[in-house]
Amino acid sequence: MGATYKNNIELTIFGESHGKAIGITIGNLPSGIQIDLDEVSRDMKRRAPGQNKMSTARKEADQVEILSGLQDGITTGAPLTGVIYNSDQHSKDYSLLKTNMRPGHSDYPAYIKYKGFNDVRGGGHFSGRITAPIVFAGNIAKQILKQKGIVVGAHILSIGNVKDERFPYNVDETLLSSLSQKQYPTIKEDVFEKMEATILKARENLDSVGGKVECVALHVPAGIGEPFFDSLESHLSSLMFSIPAVKSVSFGDGEMIDQMLGSEANDCYYYDENGDVKTSSNHNGGITGGITNGMPVSCTVTFKPTPSIAKKQKTINVETKENVELEIKGRHDPCIVQRAVVVVEAMMTLGILDMMGE
């Protein structure tokens, strides 16, 4: 089972949702970087479960114990390993799922690939729980990028049919800072009330909803990336699609850009009052030819509805070879989008830091 991303930096995740612990090892980080562990804790709390009625009732402190690579708060250059101990597992809720395949989950393909030995409790290694150590790694990367002047932020763009505003062309650090401090990061102040109603209605109906997260990175210098196979878009897409439940990734105007004419989609260059090169729009999301052009790097990530729902569904029993009905027990999110915002930020920061090492 592969669990390593390897380019200029290396990421190896480990653990299962209902195992003793989950964690990550980050290789090839620069030495001598001061890390603020309070900042790490703030991002961990943004993703943590059990904070409100719109997420799973599972409660995990998600405190990271750093085993190596950090001394007196400074990176040593050795692989940095962080571990998070699981404490609130209800494994009995999964007793039927060794043989009854959950629709929309990894159960059946994992059963085939790993010959039935995979851990299905809470999704095992396929679980969204494994994004907790990714957020830890992402915050380390976020702090390193911040020292280079690069700032990353994100917001909930939509939940179900309820939509927030998109980031403005001239998005600034003040807006990103404000969003990072909100429990429900939206640009429009009143939109999350409608999103909340959508989530709670789905839960009441024993169902779930999906949505979109929009993420930007400011002050990324021009010239980061490569054409074709090593484009920044290729690397960021690979990381974003590593987040469980992600089904679509686009950059700039993405899936809407095909409705434009070339004269509308082109981002025209100009010199500003300081002699810096800018573009008058950012339809391409700060990347052209696979390489950054100095404008904000922006992407939109789409999450499918949570597959674990309490509504009765049709499936198969792989032991009896029968068609059966399944009602999933346990504690599950009716929507993961609001908790995934910081995960998308983490992948953006890791991808940019990785490509800046080229």
Q: What residue spans do the PLM features occupy?
A:
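Alpha-helical support elements that line or immediately flank enzyme active sites
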Residues: 20-32, 128-150, 230-238, 295-297, ...
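Internal helix-turn-beta structural module
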Residues: 10, 306-358
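Glycine-rich, N-terminal phosphate-binding loop and its surrounding beta-alpha-beta segment
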Residues: 44-103, 107-109
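Glycine-rich, mobile lid/loop segments that gate access to catalytic sites or pores
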Residues: 113-228
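Short acidic, glycine/tyrosine-flanked loop/strand segments centered on an H-E-D-like triad
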Residues: 98-124, 316-332
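N-terminal, positively charged regions that mediate nucleic acid binding
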Residues: 1-58
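A short glycine/serine-rich beta->alpha loop
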Residues: 10-15, 118-130, 222-226, 282-288, ...
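Glycine-rich anion/phosphate-binding loop at the beta-strand->alpha-helix junction
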Residues: 14-20, 206-323
